[in-house]
Regions:
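A short, glycine/Asx- and small/polar-enriched loop/turn
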Residues: 113-114, 165-172
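Glycine-rich loop(s) and the adjacent beta-strand/alpha-helix scaffold that form part
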Residues: 148, 157, 161-165, 174-202
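Conserved phosphate/anionic-ligand binding catalytic regions in large, soluble enzymes, centered on
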Residues: 4-15
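Conserved redox-cofactor binding core of oxidoreductases
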Residues: 14-19, 28-159
Length: 202
């Protein structure tokens, strides 16, 4: 599902926020079936810390190598059924656990943006959180970008090509299609950051 609106998929994703591990980064190399990743977990760890701190990710640190701990806010509460199941699992198994998902939802304090506050547990998530508790571009990064005075918001635009300069060996801009007029525009910038939904862009 593509989001043809300001905020895109940041308004409709499930907010589950997990770190990749070296199990993920080394799988191609160990299995010998594909190209090895050029990075490892240690390269991304400080950026995971930064993003989790900025957007507000709640969750529980559990000390599992395949499920890396992070810079989490207090976890959301389990419901009564989940709580009972968690107790049953811990009684019967010493090598298994049940934990709440790690979600980009503020459970304590506030985060930068347009009046973001904590989750009120009112089940309004699917209509867009009126409290700004769950992370979205509209409640966090767009207001922050607007405050810089250097942002131009251009809705109704689909990036169809990243402009690559072979001499500089870097992206120098994007080519977009206006969804209303079908005109093509180019935007140049020293830095290009892509934020996209993987299935729609693969």
């Amino acid at each position: 599902m593509r989001g043809y609106h300001v905020g895109g998929r940041s308004l409709t994703w499930g907010r589950q926020s997990y770190r990749l591990t070296d199990f993920d980064f080394e799988a191609n190399w160990k299995d010998g079936i594909a190209v090895d990743w050029p990075i490892r977990y240690k390269d991304l760890a400080p950026w995971y810390d930064y993003v989790e701190g900025y957007i507000g990710v709640s969750g529980q640190n559990v000390g599992l190598p395949q499920f890396p701990d992070g810079n989490y806010l207090k976890p959301m509460e389990l419901n009564c059924v989940e709580d009972h199941l968690q107790g049953s699992i811990s009684e019967k198994y010493n090598d298994r656990l049940l934990t709440i998902g790690r979600t980009a939802i503020i459970t304590e304090g506030t985060k930068p943006g347009l009046g973001r506050s904590t989750c009120q547990y009112r089940s309004r998530c699917m209509r867009g959180c009126p409290f700004g508790a769950y992370f979205s571009s509209n409640s966090s990064t767009l207001p922050a970008a607007e405050k810089t005075g250097n942002m131009t918001l251009r809705p109704n635009s689909i990036v169809n090509e990243v402009i690559y300069d072979a001499d500089q060996k870097r992206a120098t801009g994007v080519r977009v299609i206006d969804t209303e007029t079908k005109e093509v525009y180019e935007f140049k910038n020293p830095g290009v950051a892509l934020s996209m939904f993987n299935l729609d862009n693969s």
